[in-house]
Amino acid sequence: DCVDVLLTSEWDDDDFTNFQMSKVNIHPHFFQFDNQASDGVISGFSYDQSMRSYLQFDKKMKDGHHVGMPVPMNAKLLKSTKSGDKTVEIEMAHHSTPFHVGADIMVGIEVPNGKDARWIKSITPDPNKGFAKDHKYKITFTEGMTHAHKAGQIVSTEYVRYRWWVDVDLGLVFWHDHA
């Protein structure tokens, strides 16, 4: 059996609920699993695989700097795409770090049944040579997208996909979140 979960967050960083440090993750209970990070972020010797809000495009600024963590790596599509397209044009959220070659990003992350996760093959202009002043980039993927996407849809790294292949069931299997 396989449990396949795609976890995203809409919880913005703010001073009222989480003191500018929103990071969400989940982990399972009551089945045998690998504790080396494939089954959750806080079980065993695991690196932090939590995500932040894909809806957040701004942060409170103080003296020219963001308060708390930087703006999440979120962007919006500038032009609509068709199924099979291998390139997208985006505008990164201001004050966020641009995506990088080799990263996997999700196009249309807010669309219930129309998301595309793809690896970045190239980015123009190259953010390693300086960030684009207008925050706009053209991204080429390693393969075409399955779905069409409308201009304005969100492109983000802020997701985690969990796939749990359960070896042993030890009772009521469940998972819960941490924020």
Descriptions of predicted regions:
Residues 1-72, 110, 114, 118-121, ...:
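Histidine- and aromatic-enriched segments that form or immediately flank copper-ligand environments
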Residues 72-104, 108-158:
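Small/polar beta-strand repeat architecture
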